[in-house]
Amino acid sequence: MKLLAVRRLLRIQRVVIRYRLDDLLFDLPLPWFLLALRFALPWRWFPRKPLDLSRGARLRLALQDLGPIFIKFGQILSTRRDLLPEDIADELMLLQDRVPPFDSQKSVALIEAQLGKKISDVFSRFDIEPLASASVAQVHAAKLKTGEEVVVKVIRPGLKPIIAQDLAWLFILARAAEKLSADARLLHPVDVVSDYEKTIYDELDLLREAANASQLKRNFEGSPLLYVPQVYWDWCRPKVLVMERIYGIQVTDLATLADQRTDMKMLAERGVEIFFTQVFRDSFFHADMHPGNIFVSTVQPWSPQYIAIDCGIVGSLTPEDQDYLARNLFAFFKRDYRRVAQLHIDSGWVPAETKLNEFEAAIRTVCEPIFEKPLKDISFGQVLMRLFQTARRFNMEVQPQLVLLQKTLLNIEGLGRQLYPDLDLWNTAQPFLERWMRERVSPKAVLGNIHSQIEQLPHLANMTRDLLERMSQPHAADPPAPWHKRKDDWFLRLLGTAHLGGGAVLAAGGPLHELGHWPAGIMIAVGLYLIVRR
């Protein structure tokens, strides 16, 4: 193992030298003793032919040379435009996760070991030649004994030790960067690598991907917007996934879509509707919607339907984050920057002690130039990216789900405008957001909220005692927590439920009915405020 680690280190060193990445390092504001190291590196003692490549291209080519784990890390980095300069992020977007297929006999052996059966006992046909191959898995076409056409996804054998080794080096580099550079510390490189570690290990569990696909399929069951292939659970294992084989047109194959007389405007608008439906209705969204994972069914070209595959990466938002995201977008398009700043503070995305006026001014400086464009040309993804970049300067906590959301939105926008250049994203999304916000305060939603709070009523006495005990102990030095992270919030919502119940009793002719309906109205209003306030 140590020998492998040393060989890997030498490989990394050769790539660093080949692409002059040490030049990029020494261009950073490092301490003097580290800058002096440039004279101690033997390969810098001799003249070197200059590379006619940008810094982003050099980094991209280096990651490609280092192999699939580094390629995937670069792909994830490319979505962190709140952290990276645009020229580097643009280059990393070009990274392609394409690697040669592994030996198909190994694939067969792994499938048989996972299923505990011979291939011929499960499939009437199994194509040895893979349909596709990537860094984590490869896919074979097959036909079940019961007659269904399927695809079989198989995890590459021996992948975990390779991933562990490469992650170890990424952590070493990240920790070194945090120790050596104040600028690097602001980017939290160790946190970035930790997020990647979770993502890559999640992708190794195909049962997780199968569960994600089943959930997404259930959310859009019978919908003309999106189709998700069926999972055949009887034949799914941690390293094997069997799904319905789909037939569609790649979403970027514009010529074929045009030949089928596809309604491109509707297709683009449906992409936006799918995104906002996933985020706001379901709070569960496919977070890897790049062109390779999206196809189109043109059985009805006037009503085209998207087909989504590869649900290995998904995201979700809390109800509070959904609410603040929607309100942020509305405030931004009204150019109410103070409201945007206040929402960031209220949500806990930036520290409570942030100076509102300074934060508002920073948001205005960054976002006002965006409105030089026509409204239809404004990118939601760019808006979120600019807001996150600004908030990072005010110590915004890393929000992994919001980063996934921004990446997904940028993908959807890019595809939508490729399909239909005149796509007006705000005009398409605004009615959906307005309807969602109205539904948040509808009687049905309020009653549902009340029901969930009533379930907590048995704990009301204990919660009241705990709250009074906490209030009796001074914590002046502690900054106030964001409202949606306070435990006391449950108590206040329960109090609201009690007010609603009391108001209903009075309105029905309770003990104070001789005073008229105004006490009941006040109690109901206070109850509603405590329950749905933001």
UniProtKB/Swiss-Prot annotation:
It comes from Pseudomonas fluorescens (strain ATCC BAA-477 / NRRL B-23932 / Pf-5). It comes from the Bacteria. Keywords: ATP-binding, Cell inner membrane, Cell membrane, Kinase, Membrane, Nucleotide-binding, Transferase, Transmembrane, Transmembrane helix, Ubiquinone biosynthesis. Pathway: Cofactor biosynthesis; ubiquinone biosynthesis [regulation]. Pfam families: ABC1. InterPro entries: ABC1_dom, Kinase-like_dom_sf, UbiB, UbiB_bact, UbiB_kinase. The active site is at D288 (proton acceptor). One of its GO terms (biological process) is regulation of ubiquinone biosynthetic process. Residues 125-492 form the Protein kinase domain. The keyword Transmembrane applies. It is a multi-pass membrane protein. This is Probable protein kinase UbiB. Is probably a protein kinase regulator of UbiI activity which is involved in aerobic coenzyme Q (ubiquinone) biosynthesis. One of its GO terms (cellular component) is plasma membrane.
